[in-house]
């Protein structure tokens, strides 16, 4: 567009919607600012009835302004005189036009895609600074949300809010992501990892052609995010939250953190939704979405969480105390439904006396977790108080084992001690508690609606917005109609629910629920045997007349079967007991495999404690054996330590050149 008077190409837009020449001030004809899209200028039928002006421009009666009546008359007259004089001197030559200089960041080719007006070209430093800052900010926000949830939902001490700040900031500072050569080193490492080692042609896509890339053509932003996720994985947020709880002395276990994260009670899997509201989906220098950058896809195990907590503590130089034995042991005793007064006091005495190093967090993932040591101390205390030493208390409660004449006195003394602490009642309660804990399920797995809600809100959160079609909209419609149309009650997912309210004395293999025909893994011989027994004892009268010893024998066989499932061997009760001291078990090798042998009363105690501690029964047994060996070592050496005499030596600092042995004798 060129001015008809002075042939200038620079114009100014005024408030009335018209354009005026910057040099002569003449209004441009046939051009007005409408403030609407070009498509709005065409109305129905192809006419221009649909054209609308900008609302700020009033529709007034136009008054034509001719070039003979310019807007700036003084400037126009001076310019006319200057033009006529210049043309007369130069022979009617054209006036020199203004040369508009492009800025330094001018691109030779015009952009093919719309960009922001007055947008500055992003530098290499802008890209990696923005990518790093957004990831670190999202990481710290996730830790903050988790600590807030621990305090609000689980009544954890608010002290963790003050502890988690220094821990997380020191972890970020020592991770090396803010090193001055961090971005260049990441690009260089990615180039060294190329498969063929040859220089490839960097193919820049039109969509991301302005972004920096490595020599192989990979986007630098994706390379930096890959390094950030390896250096500071999102799972470290759970580790730091647990580390703050451990440092504050809260009785929070790694199993609790993992369980709460999987249930969605602790912000982790869907925490990126809250982070996106605070930070936005993306920025100009960081085109990676928050739903990709700050979204974890799995929850680490409790074993790995505890080991990584110790690694982070060593990295930042944080000295860790032992676990809160009193708080964790109290929670375990409540879950076991055992009287707390005597057991907890004895367990604390044993812990203070032995001071096991297993109560400290370890960097070794193959080592038994600290909660196993806590439960091992409780098992030893329960065995000492209730005299659970393979004396056949559980078998005698079934009336199956008869005491011989030779050991009648021993059994009578044992019975008196067992009656004092009610060992038989304890074993029955522990057995019922085991089946109760085994049948427990997560709140999200109790029914189908809860399970689907967990999947929608946690595991598949945010997929509705990213879906390019109406797939998830259809799912929402089906989801809204499900609770109304579903009238069938969803039974909870339970294991061995028939054992919950049935005591072991009343179990019978003759019941159809217990037949081996329901077990797909049973052999044909066992199935035929159970069927034959069921046919022989099909009548209810015959079942009632069956001997109690037969039923109790079946109960013992069932316990032996359960022990075999856990790779344990059943040991009959001890007879002719000569010493009523604490019984220690050992593992023996047979054909290259370790044999775990135990009595029935000890196994009943062991398996329920392992179930509460969420650990395998054999690993729980290993922890108990390790702690018992430590106690035996202390008892063996304590007499020697008490009778040690100081060596004869001279110390000028503490004895004033005196003889230590002589001072002791005096």
Curated annotation (Swiss-Prot):
User: Which Pfam family, an example, fits this chain?
Assistant: Rrn7_cyclin_N
Region named B-reader: 30-64
Q: Which gene encodes it?
A: MEE12
Tell me a GO biological process for this protein: RNA polymerase I preinitiation complex assembly
Tissue pattern of expression reads: Expressed at high levels in seedlings, inflorescences and young siliques and at lower levels in roots. Not detected in leaves and stems. Detected in root tips and shoot apical meristems, in anthers, primarily in microspores with weaker expression in mature pollen grains and in the central cell of the mature female gametophyte. Not expressed in synergids, egg cells, antipodal cells, endosperm cells and fertilized egg cells.
**Further remark:** Expression of MEE12 in the central cell alone is sufficient to restore the normal pollen tube guidance phenotype.
Q: What does this protein do?
A: Component of RNA polymerase I core factor complex that acts as a GTF2B/TFIIB-like factor and plays a key role in multiple steps during transcription initiation such as pre-initiation complex (PIC) assembly and postpolymerase recruitment events in polymerase I (Pol I) transcription. Binds rDNA promoters and plays a role in Pol I recruitment. Required for the development of the one-cell zygote and endosperm in embryos. Required for micropylar pollen tube guidance, but has no effect on ovule development and gametophytic cell fate specification.
Q: What happens when the gene is disrupted?
A: Disrupted function of the female gametophyte. Defective in micropylar pollen tube guidance leading to zygotic lethality.
Disordered: annotated span: 45-110, 189-208, 515-548
Q: Which region ranges are annotated with the description C-terminal cyclin fold? A: 286-288
Q: Does the keyword field hold Transcription? A: yes
Name the family: Belongs to the RRN7/TAF1B family.
- What is the protein name given in its UniProt record? TATA box-binding protein-associated factor RNA polymerase I subunit B
Q: Quick check: keyword Cytoplasm in the entry?
A: no
Q: Which UniProt keywords apply?
A: DNA-binding, Metal-binding, Nucleus, Transcription, Transcription regulation, Zinc, Zinc-finger
Q: Where does Zn(2+) bind?
A: 3, 6, 21, 24
| Record GO terms (molecular function) | RNA polymerase I core promoter sequence-specific DNA binding; zinc ion binding
Q: Where in the cell is it found?
A: Nucleus, Nucleolus; Nucleus
Basic and acidic residues bias spans: 90-110, 189-202, 539-548
| Polar residues: bias regions | 78-89
InterPro entries hit by this protein: Rrn7_cyclin_N, TAF1B/Rrn7, TF_Rrn7_Zf
> Which portions of the sequence form the region B-linker?
65-80
